[in-house]
Amino acid sequence: MATATTIRRKLRTRRKVRTTTAASGRLRLSVYRSSKHIYAQIIDDSRGQTLAAASSAALKSGNKTDTAAAVGKALAAAAAEKGIKQVVFDRGSYKYHGRVKALADAAREGGLDF
């Protein structure tokens, strides 16, 4: 069960991302982290459509942090094919640390701007 702190953090993050994406008109890079895998997708909230996605389930398993970085690079490559350069990073309720940070850094190296 989620604690009150986790719920408040999640709501605070959702509110901030919602206002940021609406104000800037940028697409949203959303991250979901499970115990085994990490998933990332670029979403156009105005149309409710996923434009590019990548996950560690399709990649070779190994070190989780290295796999997260590979997902970030794969997502950046998929975004570059579709001409996407600027996004808003939506880490959800996850702290910007470890696998989430590795994915973000690799996506930046791949050419995404956030």
UniProtKB/Swiss-Prot annotation:
Return any one Pfam family short name: Ribosomal_L18p
- UniProt GO BP: translation
What is a GO molecular function of this protein? structural constituent of ribosome
Protein's UniProt keywords contain RNA-binding? yes
Q: Tell me which InterPro entries the record gives.
A: Ribosomal_uL18_bac-type, Ribosomal_uL18_bac/euk
The record's GO CC annotations read: cytosolic large ribosomal subunit
Keywords recorded for this protein, A-Z: Ribonucleoprotein, Ribosomal protein, RNA-binding, rRNA-binding
Looking up NCBIfam families in the UniProt record yields:
L18_bact (TIGR00060)
The subunit structure is: Part of the 50S ribosomal subunit; part of the 5S rRNA/L5/L18/L25 subcomplex. Contacts the 23S rRNA. Contacts protein L27 and the 5S rRNA.
UniProt similarity note: Belongs to the universal ribosomal protein uL18 family.
**What's its job?**
This is one of the proteins that bind and probably mediate the attachment of the 5S RNA into the large ribosomal subunit, where it forms part of the central protuberance.
PANTHER family reported in the protein's UniProt record: 39S RIBOSOMAL PROTEIN L18, MITOCHONDRIAL, LARGE RIBOSOMAL SUBUNIT PROTEIN UL18M
Please state what the protein is called: Large ribosomal subunit protein uL18
| Native organism | Deinococcus radiodurans (strain ATCC 13939 / DSM 20539 / JCM 16871 / CCUG 27074 / LMG 4051 / NBRC 15346 / NCIMB 9279 / VKM B-1422 / R1)
